[in-house]
């Protein structure tokens, strides 16, 4: 069940929330058995929840929750700084220096900034040039400049938020890409050796502005690739303007922020969507029999140690294919005002306010 019903999009509602007729609307307001009950939903602006005094578990300490949806990162940070919000999700890295560090808490997330290479056509149809790009990137410089140190070096597709992953890798916790990375120095079994980039090899590097750090990363990443001999054209737009083109293979490389276990709680779903021959989110267009076999084996293995081993074997097969280059394991910076206790710091970004959360002013 956890691997099938972990996504908030797959929430199971109270029978009372469902309409009596086929054309009726689902209405979750006022229904539910959790510690808090949704009392008012204000579209995209916010929501109000009240403590459920009939809750079957530990009664919530807080009488309720007033939620405000604030898409602007600077505005979220300002709400914490001015003490107009008690808990703030996703404080932007650029705002960290303006806030009391005692109010900020970093949480490793199962989200990786990843460069997908188009294996269908163009320069990156050549595995040796994919390896050249892998060796050309400098993730430490990207993390220092763009994330201001608030991210982890990329050891693979799965980062430190998946704590069991590292010990099942041949290269453990060593950084995967880069000139001195595990792949370039022979520590990744089966990794392709980098080829020489032919003069004038032109590529288009695409990303999106919805996550500011990606837009900031693109020019630096372009410089790193150009130093290896690639001629890079940058194309950065809003996500909804590039997704269809990226999936259709219109770009040679696409930089994305990808959640690896968030939707299902299990990495197999992500690997299937992104890297199998039948994948629904295959920006690299990978068709690799070894990768397909490894993913299929992981999918067929029962949850537990053997499934974890199979997942890591699939990760290695994907990395060896060169279809994707991990660049940074992202962290979320959670803001908690003075007086807040018991807030959940959840790598899966599912739990935040619990029965134990309190605010004392």
How would you label these PLM feature ranges?
Residues 46, 52-98:
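Ligand-site clamp/hinge motif
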Residues 191-260:
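Ligand/substrate-recognition segments at binding pockets and active sites
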Residues 1-18:
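Surface-exposed binding/hinge segments that line
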Residues 34-39, 47-48, 63-69, 87, ...:
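Short, well-ordered beta-strand elements
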Residues 34-35, 63-64, 82, 110-155, ...:
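Alpha-helical secondary-structure segments
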Residues 149-193, 211-216:
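Structural transition elements
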Residues 334-361:
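Long beta-strand-rich cores associated with HINT superfamily self-processing modules
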Residues 233-234, 239-242, 272-337:
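Extracytoplasmic/peripheral linker and loop segments enriched in polar/acidic and small residues
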């Amino acid at each position: 069940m956890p691997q099938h019903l972990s996504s908030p999009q797959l929430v199971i509602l109270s029978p009372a929330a469902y309409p009596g007729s086929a054309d009726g609307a689902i209405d979750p307001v006022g229904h539910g058995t959790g510690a808090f009950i949704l009392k008012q939903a204000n579209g995209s602006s916010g929501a109000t929840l009240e403590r459920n005094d009939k809750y079957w578990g530990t009664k919530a300490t807080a009488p309720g929750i007033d939620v405000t949806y604030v898409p602007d990162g600077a505005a979220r940070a300002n709400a914490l700084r001015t003490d107009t919000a008690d808990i703030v999700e996703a404080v932007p890295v650029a705002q960290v220096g303006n806030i009391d560090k005692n109010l900020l808490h970093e949480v490793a997330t199962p989200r990786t900034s990843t460069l997908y290479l188009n294996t269908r056509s163009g320069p990156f149809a050549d595995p040796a040039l994919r390896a050249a790009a892998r060796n050309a990137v400098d993730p430490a410089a990207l993390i220092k400049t763009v994330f201001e140190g608030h991210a982890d070096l990329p050891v693979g597709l799965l980062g430190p938020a998946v704590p069991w992953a590292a010990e099942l890798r041949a290269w453990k916790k060593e950084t995967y890409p880069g000139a001195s990375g595990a792949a370039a120095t022979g520590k990744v079994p089966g990794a392709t050796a980098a080829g020489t980039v032919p003069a004038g090899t032109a590529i288009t590097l695409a990303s999106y502005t919805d996550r500011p750090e990606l837009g900031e990363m693109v020019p630096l990443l372009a410089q790193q690739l150009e130093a290896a001999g690639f001629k890079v054209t940058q194309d950065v737009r809003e996500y909804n303007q590039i997704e269809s083109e990226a999936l259709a293979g219109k770009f040679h490389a696409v930089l994305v922020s990808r959640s690896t276990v968030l939707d299902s709680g299990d990495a197999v779903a992500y690997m299937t969507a992104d890297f199998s021959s039948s994948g629904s989110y295959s920006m690299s267009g990978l068709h690799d029999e070894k990768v397909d076999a490894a993913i299929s084996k992981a999918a067929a293995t029962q949850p537990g140690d053997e499934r974890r081993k199979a997942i890591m074997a699939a990760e290695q097969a994907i990395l060896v294919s060169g279809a994707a280059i991990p660049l940074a394991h992202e962290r979320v910076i959670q803001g908690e005002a003075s007086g807040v206790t018991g807030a959940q710091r959840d790598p899966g970004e599912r739990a935040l306010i619990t029965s134990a959360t309190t605010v004392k002013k």
